Amino acid sequence: MAAGTGLLATSLSSCAGPPMLEASVIDHRITVPLSAFVGSDFQIIQPEGFLFDIGLVKGADGKFQAFVLECTHASTQLTPAGDGYTCPEHGSTFDIKGKVTRGPAQLPLRQLQTGVSSDTVTIYLR
């Protein structure tokens, strides 16, 4: 592994719903192996020491988008629900791409920059 990249733990959540991957954060980056997307276009990343999970989505075009799963209304951890995320605090919902589908939230989820190499996706937390 190159210096300055995050290490992804191999443990997957056994609960129903999208896979959840625990990740180390190094130099404000997380590295996810592309092999994590075999059979799934969506992963929940649980960054070590980070307040909120990250939704990592692989689009039909093969591009990746990462969103901080923090409600933009109540600053609450969102939970995966159907084809998006729900805020347990006041019921705001967001689609898989972070767009508000039901308020009271009005702003989309914060998107994080991603980069792809031959075998990994890097999520930049800054």
Pin down the residues of each PLM region.
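N-terminal export signals
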Residues: 1-16
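N-terminal pre-ligand scaffold of iron-sulfur
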Residues: 15-81, 108-126
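Short Pro/Gly-enriched beta-strand edge/turn motifs at strand-loop
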Residues: 36-39, 93-99
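Structural motif
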Residues: 47-49, 89, 96
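Surface loops and adjacent helix of pleckstrin homology
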Residues: 69, 90, 97-99, 126
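Short Cys/His-rich "knuckle" micro-motifs
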Residues: 78-82, 95-98
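Short cysteine/histidine-rich metal-coordination sites, predominantly Zn2+-binding motifs
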Residues: 85-91, 101-110
